[in-house]
Amino acid sequence: MYIQVLGSAAGGGFPQWNCNCVNCKGYRDGTLKATARTQSSIALSDDGVHWILCNASPDIRAQLQAFAPMQPARALRDTGINAIVLLDSQIDHTTGLLSLREGCPHQVWCTDMVHQDLTTGFPLFNMLSHWNGGLQWNRIELEGSFVIDACPNLKFTPFPLRSAAPPYSPHRFDPHPGDNLGLMVEDTRTGGKLFYAPGLGQVDEKLLAMMHGADCLLVDGTLWEDDEMQRRGVGTRTGREMGHLAQNGPGGMLEVLDGFPRQRKVLIHINNTNPILDEDSPERAEVLRRGVEVAFDGMSIAL
């Protein structure tokens, strides 16, 4: 299985266009050793030719331009994207669909709840129906696994994660299973398994068991501290309120990942306020000391 990190930042990217926190300002001033990042999305393939896009970020055009296999140039109009899987209906994971309209129809896999949001509060399915067949919905059931024809050797097993629906959603304050998913993806030829959960608010025993069965853990790296947005003066909500488990402290993501010495461990969906973006910071050093990697745009993983 080939895993390509197209975007590794949280919503807004890094640096965020309207932010002057210490990280964003430091990057622009050249006083911070850091790498710019686009909003999170990955692509998966079982052959390096046919790709499945997991989430479609607002930065999708630049992300596709940066990854040559996404333009195989076999015809006048071509793409390496053969299907799209949406893990939720958040703005920063779905807006990129608008930029893919020239390539419609697209096979889009998502849950009932995500499809409901994307036909009501943010009706992308309705809007794009006017472009050559638009988005063709394939339902993700919350039980069992599914296979996408373009990559027949990849088996997708979804699992619901506790998180709120987007602010625009008609059921914003009425959460349902299927609002937010993680994925276990297995290459049935190599046996390699990816645990992918860019929005992970809490880890229970069931999730721990799944993580132990994976070879690579690509997980939520949004915040270093739960109250980071408050500390940086750019927000009022905590990580837990937003559905993100912070890395630092008792019960934090790093402590969770300490329990997986065998697995490759990678943080993704990193917020612009997170000090691990500063490559010279003690927080970045602590992450690396504990055997955890920080995802970057263009990162490639093979399982």
From Swiss-Prot:
CDD domains (UniProt xref): PQQB-like_MBL-fold
Any single biological process term in GO: pyrroloquinoline quinone biosynthetic process
Domain of life: Bacteria
One Pfam match: Lactamase_B_2
Record keywords, A-Z: PQQ biosynthesis, Transport
InterPro entries according to UniProt: Metallo-B-lactamas, PQQ_synth_PqqB, RibonucZ/Hydroxyglut_hydro
Pathway in which the depicted protein is active: Cofactor biosynthesis; pyrroloquinoline quinone biosynthesis
Family annotation (PANTHER family): COENZYME PQQ SYNTHESIS PROTEIN B, HYDROLASE C777.06C-RELATED-RELATED
Function: May be involved in the transport of PQQ or its precursor to the periplasm.
Family designation: Belongs to the PqqB family.
Protein name: Coenzyme PQQ synthesis protein B
Organism annotation: Pseudomonas putida (strain ATCC 700007 / DSM 6899 / JCM 31910 / BCRC 17059 / LMG 24140 / F1)
Highest classification ranks of the organism: Bacteria, Pseudomonadati, Pseudomonadota, Gammaproteobacteria, Pseudomonadales
